Amino acid sequence: MLGEVTTVYVFLIELGSLLLYCYRVFGVRRRIPSTLLMGIACFAVYYAVNKLADNNVAVNIIFGFLVNYVILKLGFKANVKTAVFHSVLLAGVLTATEFIGILLISGFFGINIADYRSNDVLYAMVAVIAKTLYLISCLVISNFTSREKQHIDHGHSWYLLISPFSSVYIIVLI
């Protein structure tokens, strides 16, 4: 049960980070609610494919790239080359942050790297670390790649950090 909740949490944080990144770097092509609904639909398909592929890493990376591309192309003002570049960039950052999370947890607890997939609590801890790093990376990269060099209010984007820390609190309570 905790593993499924964590997986849904992972996809929601990835969607939120992607939309925040795209909103800061590109202009919105459609209205924000329709872009959000499109993103939720894309990530629902992504979640289903992830479940059918039994959380296969290669399928996860490839399909994550495709979902990022579709959201960038349909929901935001990105041309094909830019959408491909940013999709590859975000897929690479996501892979790197997940690998860092796995290495940190396996090093801290002295366990095999593959054990996090069979232990729901370790999986949740890896998810919290990886998604926090992913969100921070998206915010930092969007500061450098934003087309508009005007002042951007950073206050609201940091509210997304509440979710990883609150999930750690919930895990501790369980």
Model region roles, listed by residue range:
Residues G16-P33, N50-L173:
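Juxtamembrane segments at transmembrane-helix boundaries
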Residues E4-V8, G39, N55:
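Intrinsically disordered, low-complexity linear regions
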Residues L36-A44, A48, V140:
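Alpha-helical hydrophobic membrane-insertion segments
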Residues M1-E14, A124-A127:
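Hydrophobic transmembrane alpha-helical segments in integral membrane proteins
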Residues V10, L15-L19, G39-F43:
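Primarily extracytoplasmic/secreted proteins
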